[in-house]
Amino acid sequence: MSDTSTKTTLPNEEKFKDLMDLPYSELESIDDADFWAHYWAVWNANNPCVPGGPFVPNPEQEWVLQLMDEGKSIFINSPAGTGKSALVKHWCSKTTTKNIGLTSTTGISALNLGGSTVHSFLGIGLGVDTVDELYDRILKNHDKRELWLRLDVLVIDEVSMLQPELFDKLERLARKLRSSSERFGGIQIIATGDLFQLPCVGNDSSLIVDSKKFKKCIQVTIKLRNIVRQEDAQFKAVLNKVRVGLVDEHVEQVLKSRFGKTKSLPSNIRPTKLFCTRKSVQDINEKHLNKLAEMGYEFREYNMEFINQECPISFEYIVQNFTRNSTTPETLHLCLQTQVVLTYNQSPYLVNGSRGVVVDFTEEEYPVVEFLNGTTQVIKPHKFALHYTSRRGKTQQVGYAVQIPLKIAYALTIHSCQGLTIDYAIIDLNDCFEFGQAYTALSRVKTLDGLFLKKFDFGVIQPHPRALEYEQQ
């Protein structure tokens, strides 16, 4: 990947003005970083964004809206902050003649989008069952069966975090449920994401574009270029370089200027703390709980209960595997004023990832949580199904884990905040272990002034090799 700071010859001013008047579809194929930097600088200066105002699409977004209106299945593979989610929400709001499924791969990004997780919306549970098992499951659920049959468009935000094997499974399931030989059963696919951000958790080195079905379903792949989350040209340039793993002297200089700046934060600002690992997040959360204890708040303890349903192998092994991978803690301590996050969907508006504060407890000792969207809800214990997969690939339910679906949330992992925009963030990148993790974290923040970094080794900034390969194709 070439250094985007390298100077190339720009069109003369007269020719550039002529190009600005052309339809974006005629310019889209131009692969010149300096041209696009100049193009968007001029366009943004003449069309300033109004904070809180209505969504006004720019030329490249207008082009994408036209493709969606035409019924094209598209993949918007674009940098963080280019308005992918806002664009999709705008199209869905103005498209009233189609049944649209608005989904994302994570709870937090689904909440940000105003939709549901793809697993919840399509009724596939964890998605671990075979196509035939999922088919039987959906046939037994009248509402989900009707949903699949009526669906015209399926939006999948943050699709780069979806396992390619699961997409293949969904494509086959769609054709089977709808008795159709068309790709994805004739459903239009609108997928958005960024291959340079975090890939799906627990997967090998493959990406969504390694799915054979995905390649066949997608008719147009789009790269949006105009970053709207950050306005500072210098910060944009740094993020564009970090995205592809280009760490030059300028990148180091700018990021080092944000080391150890937390003391300059106003006292009324509570920045979001982002960490690479669950362990670091747990340590911060425990620190805040200890402060609440010192203030005299009374804690309630909730322990996960496990129910065995004739498991064919060691049930202890099943339990250990579940607790190791579950986002719901085995032991949960809560008191008034504890900041929490949901770990299981409660409603279309309260989903896995919704953040809130404990404001009361019921007579049964269930926590009452006031969420950021203003909703207050009693959170009761949930039964999490425990599964076992045989060597032949047969998956069966072997028991339950019962727990209050909450966890402490004073700090977040970088994985859990992909797709979000954050005003102020304290980021610790010292334990980066995944391709794209550093870029994902840095690109959450709107301004350099809102970015506060712990010192880190710049060697942790690494793009996914397959993402680079795909970008260069």
Swiss-Prot record:
Q: Which Gene3D superfamilies match?
A: P-loop containing nucleotide triphosphate hydrolases
Matching InterPro entries: AAA+_ATPase (IPR003593), DNA_helicase_pif1-like_DEAD (IPR010285), P-loop_NTPase (IPR027417), PIF1_helicase (IPR051055)
Q: Which PANTHER family match?
A: ATP-DEPENDENT DNA HELICASE
GO-annotated molecular function: ATP hydrolysis activity; DNA helicase activity
Q: Name one Pfam family in it.
A: PIF1
Report what the protein is called: Uncharacterized protein 106R
**Organism in which the protein naturally occurs:** Invertebrate iridescent virus 3 (IIV-3)
Q: List the disulfide bonds.
A: none
Assigned protein family: Belongs to the IIV-6 030L family.
GO BP, one annotated term? DNA repair
